[in-house]
Amino acid sequence: MTDAKKDGFAHFDLGAMAKSDSYKLLASVIMPRPIAWVVSRDAEGLLNAAPFSFFNILSADPPLVAIGFSAAADREGKDTLTNIKAQGEFVVNLVPEELAQAMNITATNAPRGVDETRLAGLELTKCEVVNVPRIVGSPVGLECKLFQVIETGGTGTIVLARIVYAHVRESAFANLAKLYVDPAQLRLIGRMHGSGGYCTTRDTFTIDRLSWPLEGKD
């Protein structure tokens, strides 16, 4: 923590902090985060599943997602990154409330050679483009092809991937023809602080977008 400025804030110089402390701080304030439940396949065909919350969509044209991996991550994170680099494809499944415990099982530090999809009892189905299955219980499955790997120069690696095919549970649409999704029907969870903090996405509110010029504003 930097000098106390008595302004009601704690101040941090991230460059002077231990990496574990900066991770702890940032992961506790940048939230909630969506969770990419990644299914990948190794060169021998063995499946791997692991959740990652350093994840989001970065572009719609082309449709790109980003996933952050840490060298200090558990074995699963390393296996997933290795598979993505070697095979160039994977599936991002979004996590519904009812599969939270199964997702947590796939986050364990299982040894290499363990198929976490079987360990968690997940039902899988074939994808349309990539040679990796998606999780049936997930309301959203995104088939992805590797776009770019960015080595950050620190302990992290960022994977950019192009979404080539999307699967969205039909019952989640308020109007399929207009692509209106009812988020409440997805029942997705997000990552919060600490080693086991999560949130639901059921408690939402709506604010209408404003147009310029703003009424009552000079």
Predicted regions and their residues:
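Basic, polyanion-binding surface patches
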Residues: 1-218
